[in-house]
Amino acid sequence: MKRFFIFISLHLLLFLIVIAYQAQASEDGWTINDDKDYIYLTKNGDVIYGDKLIFSMDYNDCDKLYHLFTFLTTKAPDDVQQFANKRIPITLNDMEFSAEVIHIQPILNNRAYWVMFALGEYETEKYVKLLSGFIKEHKRYEIVLADGLNFEVEKYFDITRNSWRLDKFSEKFAETYKRCKEKTTHKDS
């Protein structure tokens, strides 16, 4: 009976830890990270949690914004590497675009791949205003990988769509931009 009680207690504790973590993570879901050269504002996906929407700025030029996203695939054959530096068709909230594959990282002994895409490089203030207007009109930011010339998306990706809620984007981006500018100012001093 004592073992059963310990077993139940441990499972209950684990359950509470998981629930508490999820509640904390779902509060706004944004993460600000940096390294020596860049600062990143990221948000995990709603469909595949590990997929990220990324806004990045170089400390040398905070007025230039890089908009990136990642998709994880466990379906891609070995020839997935052929798409590095190529543009792949996507839809972004039902509007047709393309995104450049800028990095493919094999993981799990080459049984899966992280694929990083670039949507582009933009003037920070203009792009953030544009995106803030977009957020007011749409509840979600949804990216769907699409078929293209010599590219069948289902051959390479098991899950072809993800979405992100961009609640509190403006506030979090303002904080990220401020930190970028502060570090740039400290570098110049």
Residue ranges of model-derived segments:
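Classical Sec-dependent N-terminal signal peptides that target proteins to the secretory pathway
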Residues: 1-25
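A generic "folded-domain core" signal
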Residues: 23-189
